[in-house]
Amino acid sequence: MKFISWNVNGLRACVGKDFESQFKALDADFFCLQETKMQEGQLDLKFEGYESYWNYAEKKGYSGTAIYTRHQPLSVSYGMGVEEHDHEGRVITLEYDNFYLVTCYTPNSQTELKRLDYRMTWEDDFRKFLKDLDAKKAVVVCGDLNVAHQEIDIKNPKTNRRNAGFTDEERDKMTELLNDGFTDTFRYLHPEEVTYSWWSYRFKAREKNAGWRIDYFLVSDRLREQITEAKIHTDIMGSDHCPVEVDLAL
């Protein structure tokens, strides 16, 4: 099964930049989107053979997630069941016979780390949410997790040390999650590869490949042997992020 995840940084804008042909070319079983930045009814985007599920932020033009799937789920849930976190459209979970698929758009800690304290609360609650799912069946979790985990995952680690997305606190929370039974699929297959998934729109960052790897597929450790491929599609444009992929023998 082929899974794709892409922070589209505004789906309506991305549709104007060839999204539909990219979607069809990637030909995924599951296509997860983050930062859709839209409300219900603003875009009617259907693909033959796919059902879609949407979680919208209450605030207009902000956050939001979606999943297109070729496989009818047993159940669908939105958010993580924590009132504090469930107003921004950040999480969707699809349940299948032998796994859960979770897509997530993790809150950014923002300039001057204004939202870092909230981010720490989110991290603990999201980790508990995933562990509770994992106790029932295996989990595939994807999305913009808004952290470059190790120095290999960011072009300029020294100058970004206290910037949102590369603080010790955020990196430690990712380590905690992985230590609690999850595997970073790309790093598992490609331990030394330097590839990024996000580039600032400023300073010609993408042209210079001054990027960050902040988009992930994580799987329950017991799915490790079923990871057949993990890719980052750096050639696909349309957003400041590019799509990431995992193929699993499920």
Outline where the language-model segments fall.
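Active-site-proximal beta-strand elements of phosphoester/diester hydrolases
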Residues: 1-9, 98-110, 142
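Active-site beta-strand termini and strand-to-loop segments that position acidic
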Residues: 70, 94-97, 220-221, 246-250
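Surface-exposed cleft-lining segments at the edges of enzyme active sites
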Residues: 81-82, 107-123, 158-162
